[in-house]
Amino acid sequence: MPNWCNNNLVLEHDDPAMIKRAYDALERGEFLNEFVPVPKDLMIVAGSVGDPVEQAKLEADTQRNLEVYGYGNWYDYCVGEWGTKWDVGDQGCSDIHPEGRMLHTSFDSAWAPPTGAYAKLEALGFRVEAMYYESGMCFAGVYKDGCDEEINLEGMSADEIESEHPDLDECFGISESIREYQAMEEEELTAWVKDGAEKTAELKTL
């Protein structure tokens, strides 16, 4: 299973129909494929299939796809064009602004944010503002005005994140999660030390 990257996204478009299209795609869990579709020819596996005849066909199809699309299979296409290997949405976290020209949503993506797709959405007239946080690899960032600013959080304390990156911290509760994790570790250490002391005392009475 991948590390999950948390995403918060605001989309704007002058055409309410495009916002509704994005909303519907998110509800289906097909947001990225709606606007940056994977060619059907790329829906093949990567690597080995075992059977020699099938393997030869797979290798021929992969080579042809590389020549036509620049990618051998769906996985490489998604990582290259979307920025993440699976589609996003289907989490019931999307809302359209009453005027119909703005959408706010949150979702998880595999390993990384779909910043590659954001650039292509902008080419379709969307204005994109997004924040993301991946706790497993300790990075976060902001995508705005076509620029992706990734921030390395490794080694930063809860206080440092709270003061230096307040918007990201407010969005994802990063400092709170760090403090909760540290408190849990302290409780486990205290319990371990107490248990060890009790066992030592029992041995001395024998």
Model features per residue range: what roles?
Residues 1-206:
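Long, contiguous binding/interaction regions
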